[in-house]
Structures are given as C-alpha cells and as structure tokens.
From Swiss-Prot:
Signal peptide: none annotated. Residues 32-115, 178-199 are cytoplasmic. This is Golgi to ER traffic protein 1. It comes from the Eukaryota. Required for the post-translational delivery of tail-anchored (TA) proteins to the endoplasmic reticulum. Together with GET2, acts as a membrane receptor for soluble GET3, which recognizes and selectively binds the transmembrane domain of TA proteins in the cytosol. The GET complex cooperates with the HDEL receptor ERD2 to mediate the ATP-dependent retrieval of resident ER proteins that contain a C-terminal H-D-E-L retention signal from the Golgi to the ER. Belongs to the WRB/GET1 family. GO terms for cellular component: endoplasmic reticulum membrane; GET complex; Golgi membrane. GO terms for molecular function: protein-membrane adaptor activity.
Amino acid sequence: MLLPDLHPYTILLSIFLVLVVKQLVATIGKSTIQEFVWLVYLKVSSNQSIKTYNSKQHELHETNRQKRAISAQDEYAKWTKLNRQADKLSAELQKLNQEIQQQKSSIDKASNALILVLTTLPIWIARVFYRKTHLFYIRQGIFPKYVEWVLALPFLPNGAVGLTIWMFAVNSVVSNFSFLVSFPFAKRVSKPVRDTKVE
C-alpha cells in the first residue's frame, strides 16, 4: 500500500476536519478568501511595483488637490503644468496597475490551488486508499438488517460503518449547521406584493 495504515479514528477525525474546512470555504467563498490572501500579500510583500504604485497614487492625489486649489484662469501656466503632471502620473499608474493585476492573477491561482489541495485532494486520497477500512462498528440489533446493510456500503460487512457513509453523514451535519449559523446573517428577502389587476 502506498499510504500508511492509519487507525480508523485517525481517518475519521481527519476526514471530519477536511469536510469542516471545505464547508467553511464554501460558506465564506473562494473569492473572499482570495481577496484576503491578496491583501495579506500586499501587506507583507516587498514588491517594488506595489510600493511605486502606492507612492505614485499618493503623488497623483496631491497633484489633483493642488490643481483644484488654484484657478485655471488666474494661474494658467501653473495649472497646465500640474495637469500635465497628473496625466503623466495617470499613465504610469495605469501601466503599474496592469503589472499588479498580473501578480494578483498569479496569487489568485496559487490560493485556488492551495484551497483545492486542502479540501479536495485529501478526500479523494481517502476514498481511493481507505474505502475498505472499518471506521467503527454498530452493535447488532440496534438497526434492522437492511439499515445495517446500507451503512456498510459499498465494501464492508454488515455492522461496520465505512468512509462513504461517514462522509455523507458528516457533510449533512456540517452543511445543516453551517446553514443554521449563516441564516440569521443572510440578506433579508422582502415580502412579496400581490399584483393588482387594472381593469
């Protein structure tokens, strides 16, 4: 076997944690997580183009403030000089923005790959390598035979609970719990109004 022989409770807990993380990602949203990763990258990165972009943006703001403070009719030469400087800064900012957007795209791809590796890959590995592992047993006689048979699907003897049923149960519980927690914060739906017929 390629993977180590794990204790059933280790598999049980690790799959539970992976499914909880997967539900958290689904609830929060990949785009929100990617935006958070990008903001963290902006804070910790020593990338020169980001620093240049921030300084040029501040410089453009100052130039526009000075431009608004003077009258174009009274001080035409100074206003024109500031206007040219603002146009030049805007062009430089646009070029830097394209570079930064390319970096953001690569950061988004990396964070998307990390989310995929953390939430999907462990589930598929467990499904392939631990599908015949008995996670726990149910005492005989608690459920009817057909329920024991369903709980043992797809590869286990009656009375055993395997990975497939465990994942199904955990997914159901975690998604219902997530719904209960997020429901009060969901956007409120307005009460429908009946259309009145005009005759």
